[in-house]
Design a protein with these regions (language model features):
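Short polar/charged helix/loop
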Residues: 4-147
Length: 147
């Protein structure tokens, strides 16, 4: 029935690696990574990066995630590298798809999400909640692909 959703990671484990990419790696991708880490536990590896990373994570995104009991304050924005894409099974872009290197055999998705930069907490909560719903769907797909 076609190819599997995920290629098994060829490293030491068979847990899939998911890379979240947004322009600044300060809001959307950090929230998505935080949710997947919290919900997947050791069932997956999570990376995040940005094509033009900021110096720090958006404080309103940190606040919105803290309301969910998820601490993303200890992270820091990272530059997107070819290696990060190559080492991932699933690449989720959020507004920067063209900046992401393409490797055959990867699963790519582009999530159209509003940028939380400059937004108030109410707006960021809405973005956060949309990300959570998408993460729950992604996680169910990843877990069913491993069976």
């Amino acid at each position: 029935m076609g190819s599997p959703l995920l290629r098994k990671h060829a490293a030491m484990s068979d847990t899939p690696t998911v890379l979240f990419v947004c322009v600044h790696n300060a809001g959307r991708s950090q929230m998505a990574a935080g949710y997947l880490k919290a919900l997947a536990g050791d069932r997956g590896e999570v990376l995040s990066a940005g094509s033009e990373p900021k110096d720090q994570i958006n404080p309103v995104a940190i606040q919105a995630m803290a309301e969910e009991g998820i601490d993303i304050a200890s992270g820091s924005p990272k530059i997107l590298t070819t290696e990060a894409v190559r080492d991932s099974d699933v690449v989720i872009t959020m507004g920067c798809g063209d900046a992401c290197p393409f490797f055959p055999g990867k699963r790519y998705e582009d999530w159209e999400l509003e940028d939380p930069a400059g937004q108030d907490i109410e707006a960021v909560r809405g973005i956060r909640d949309e990300i959570k719903g998408r993460i729950e769907v992604l996680l169910s797909e990843i877990l069913s692909a491993k069976v």
